[in-house]
Each structure stands twice: as C-alpha cells, then as structure tokens.
Curated annotation (Swiss-Prot):
Belongs to the prokaryotic/mitochondrial release factor family. Keywords: Cytoplasm, Methylation, Protein biosynthesis. Pfam families: PCRF, RF-1. This is Peptide chain release factor 1. Methylated by PrmC. Methylation increases the termination efficiency of RF1. Peptide chain release factor 1 directs the termination of translation in response to the peptide chain termination codons UAG and UAA. Residues 306-325 have a biased composition (Basic and acidic residues). It is found in: Cytoplasm. It comes from Synechococcus sp. (strain CC9902). Residues 290-325 are annotated as: Disordered. One of its GO terms (molecular function) is translation release factor activity, codon specific. InterPro entries: PCRF, Pep_chain_release_fac_I, Pep_chain_release_fac_I_sf, Prokaryotic/Mito_RF, RF-1. One of its GO terms (cellular component) is cytoplasm. The modification N5-methylglutamine is found at residue 239.
Length: 365
C-alpha cells in the first residue's frame, strides 16, 4: 500500500471516528440500546487506528525537525552525531508504526467480532474417532477458559466407548470468530488408541466446523419450513430419566438439516437453542456457497473455513502437531492443553501476509 493510499484511508477512518463520537452524544442514540452498542463497538475498533495515525503524524514532524537540525549542525560533529542517532531512532519507530497501521487497514471480515458455534464430528476411525472428537472439544474448552470466553455444550451424541459422534458447543466472547475460524477443517490424529491391544498406531479424524452466530434478522426462518417434535430427554434410567418431553427435534425441510437439543431444562429453552443452531448452520451454508463462487486462490487461503480441508495432524509418537497450511510443527502436549496462542497467532500472521500480497497485486493492476 503506497503512502498516499495509506494516508487517504487513515483520514477516512478518522472522519468516521469523529462522526461516531458525535452520534454517541445524540440523545436518540442513547435511547436505542442496540444502536448504541453497535456505534460504541465500531468507535472502539477505530480508536486505536486514529491514535496511531496521530502518533504517526507527530513522528513525521519530529523526523522533519531532526533532519533540519542535522543540516544546521554540519560544523558541529558532536551535534551531528546526536541528531543522526535521534533520526535513526525516529525512523525505526516510524517504520514499525507504518507496518502496524497497514495491517490494521487490511480488509476485515465483518464476522470477526462474533461468537461462534463449534460443531465437532467424529470422522474415519470408529470408536477412536469419537474419543478424538472429545479430546478436541476439551482442547477448545481449555483455550476458551484461558481467554475468559463462555463455553457451553448445546447438543451432543455420545459414543459407547467415550467421546462423541457429534458435538455442538457455543463459544461466546470478544472476537471469538477472528481466532477460531482457523480451526475449521479435518483434524487427523496418529496414536495408539486406548482400545488397541496390540500397541499399533491408528490414524483417525474428526471434522470441525466453525459457525458464526446468526441472529433472527440475518437468517429468517419461515415457520412452514420447520417440522418440530418433542421427546423425553435421555438418561441413565430411574430418577435420571426426564418424565416431561423437554427434548426438541427440529427439521428444516428445504435443506434437510436436523437439530436435536436435549441439554436445557425446559422444552422452550431447547427450542430456542435448536433455532440458534439452525440459523448458524444455514448461515454457514450460505457463506460456504459464497466462498465456492470465489476464485480457487481465495479458497486456498488460511482461514477459508472449508470443513473438508485437511488442516492439521496430531502425532503422539513424535509429540508433534503439524499445521499443513503453515508447513510448521508445534509441540503436541501444550496444544492439547489448550495453549493455542502460538498456533493461531501464526495463522493470523499468514492471513495478514496473504491479504498484503493480494492488496499489492491489486495496486499493481
């Protein structure tokens, strides 16, 4: 991004920021909680950008002053050295700030701020794949807890020997999608299963889908398209069996998507959860179709959200996690304990690199 384009975009962002500040002082906005929240969130997003732009302008003035001092002190060797040292320091700060601002101005996914629903499905590998799906669920739960996110199980189908055939988890917090979107795809594990008596290494898989939460306005549901039935929630028998039909079985007839919710205490709560999951699934289908229409270059990017992409292998024998998109290895045990910061950070850096490359190609054209 050239200097004039960067300055123009920063000036536009500053103008938007000032406009948002004026709107926040408007009594009509103060009386509209949803609008107030939207404006306040956008203002908070732009504020660091505006402050960095102001710092950049100040640095550029200081650089100009240092160059002037350098010219005026040609006859004073000691002063020349001081002025040159100051100029070098200012130029280093200027370069770092320019890089940060350039990254901040890259095209932004409007879904990055959202909470998500994680759908984890056992893939190839039978019982071991179900156990592996449970291990992945615990990995994400630990990561979410470290970041102060709320992680709640919405729906699950448990397997006979442990783990899950399918699990849907709600993850609520700040900018959850911006990080977990890199987890969508096929996760492969290579290890000796607990069910293996001969000590042989097996390869199993689980698929992760990352669905940004969708509201009722974004995904409209026609009641005629829904088939809803109820059932008693399952249990271990005796007093643990729910005598009231609280479970909800929801079918979206046009797509064939079925959602079964039993986790909540009341039928109404399970119905609301089922509708939330359905909206998220429908939004994911819509986004996947849009991605399919885009170029193959776009789909090859990290974080494209393709649930069929083989993204990672977890090798227990070598204590190694390999991210195939990055071509990098990470220590296995910390990753399984939810220490995903380095891995996800590397994915974010790669996404930024790809966006910068695309921006450079657009500028060249």
């Amino acid at each position: 991004m050239d200097a004039s384009t960067l300055t123009s975009r920063l000036q536009t962002a500053t103008a938007s920021f000032r406009s948002l500040e004026r709107q926040l002082a408007d009594p009509d906005v103060a009386n509209d909680p949803k609008r107030l929240e939207t404006i306040a969130r956008e203002r908070s997003r732009l504020e660091p950008l505006v402050l960095d732009f102001e710092a950049l302008q100040k640095l550029e003035q200081e650089q100009a002053d240092a160059r002037e001092l350098l010219r005026e002190s040609r006859s004073d060797a000691a002063m020349q050295e001081l002025a040159q040292d100051e100029l070098s320091e200012l130029e280093a700060q200027h370069t770092a700030l320019l890089q940060r601002l350039t990254l901040a101005l890259l095209p932004r996914d409007p879904r990055d701020d959202r909470s998500v629903m994680l759908e984890i499905r056992a893939g190839a590998g039978g019982d071991e794949a179900c156990i592996w799906a449970g291990d992945l669920a615990r990995m994400y739960e630990r990561y979410g807890q470290k970041l102060g996110w709320s992680v709640q199980q919405l729906s699950c189908t448990e397997a006979d020997l442990g783990g899950y055939r399918e699990l849907i988890v709600s993850v609520k917090g700040t900018s959850v999608f911006s990080q977990l979107k890199f987890e969508a795809g096929v996760h492969r594990v290579q290890r000796v299963p607990a069910t293996e008596s001969q000590g042989r290494v097996h390869t199993s898989t689980a698929t992760v889908a990352v669905m940004p939460e969708a509201d009722a306005v974004e995904v409209e549901l026609d009641p005629k398209d829904l088939e809803i039935s109820t059932a008693r929630s399952g249990g271990a028998g005796g007093q643990n069996v729910n005598k009231v039909e609280t479970a909800v079985d929801l079918l979206h007839k046009p797509t064939g998507i079925r959602v079964f919710c039993t986790q909540q205490r009341s039928q109404l709560q399970n119905r609301e959860r089922a509708l939330e999951i359905l909206r998220a699934k429908l939004l994911e289908r819509e986004l996947a179709a849009a991605a399919e229409r885009e170029s193959s270059h776009r789909r090859s990017q990290v974080g494209s959200g393709d649930r069929s992409e083989k993204i990672r292998t977890y090798n227990y024998k070598d204590n190694r996690t390999t991210d195939h998109r990055l071509g990098r290895n990470f220590s296995l045990e910390p990753v399984l304990q939810g220490q995903l910061e380095d891995l996800i950070g590397a994915c974010i850096a790669e996404e930024q690199r790809q966006k910068l490359e695309a921006l450079s190609e657009e500028t060249d054209d």
